[in-house]
C-alpha cells in the first residue's frame, strides 16, 4: 500500500571492544550488511508477508530511484548487480563475518537466502563461494 518505500541497512561495523562499553558509552549501530537480505527473506518472503519481487524492489529498485542512481540491466551497461541464492540455508556465525563488526543480533539463528555474488561496474567484488571481495 506504499507504507514502506524502501529498506536499507545501517551497516555500522564496530569492534567487539567498541560495543562492550555499556549502553551509554558503546558505539551505536549494528552490522547489517551480511544478514539484511537473509533476515528479510527468511522472515518476510518465506512467511508470505511480501513477495521476493517486492523485497528486491524495496532493497534495490526503489533506493536507486529515490537517490537518482542511474543504471539498470541494459545491453551495453556495465553490470551493477547482486546475485542471490534464495534457497541457501545457513546459520549466522558473526565470527565469520568479513566485516570488522563481529556482533549480530542474529547470531546462531537459521536463515534462508544469501548473497551469492556482487558485481560492480562489470567486476566481481564479492563471491560467496570463495569469501573474497
Protein language model annotation of sequence segments:
Residues 25, 78-133:
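C-terminal cap of metal-dependent C-N hydrolases
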Residues 1:
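Acidic, glycine-rich loop-and-beta core segments that form the ion-binding/anion-interacting portion
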Residues 5-7, 12-87:
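His/Asp/Glu-enriched, well-ordered alpha-helical/loop segment
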Amino acid at each position: 500500500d506504499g507504507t514502506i518505500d524502501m529498506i536499507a541497512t545501517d551497516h555500522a561495523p564496530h569492534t567487539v571492544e567498541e560495543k562492550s562499553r555499556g549502553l551509554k558509552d558503546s558505539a551505536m549501530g549494528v552490522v547489517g550488511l551480511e544478514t539484511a537480505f537473509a533476515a528479510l527473506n527468511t522472515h518476510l518472503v518465506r512467511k508470505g508477508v511480501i513477495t521476493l519481487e517486492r523485497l528486491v524492489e524495496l532493497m534495490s529498485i526503489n533506493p536507486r530511484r529515490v537517490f537518482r542512481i542511474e543504471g539498470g540491466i541494459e545491453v551495453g551497461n556495465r553490470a551493477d548487480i547482486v546475485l542471490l541464492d534464495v534457497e541457501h540455508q545457513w546459520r549466522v556465525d558473526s565470527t565469520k563475518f568479513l566485516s570488522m563488526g563481529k556482533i549480530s543480533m542474529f547470531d546462531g539463528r537459521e536463515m534462508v537466502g544469501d548473497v551469492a555474488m556482487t558485481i560492480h561496474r562489470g567486476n566481481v567484488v564479492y563471491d560467496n563461494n570463495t569469501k573474497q571481495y
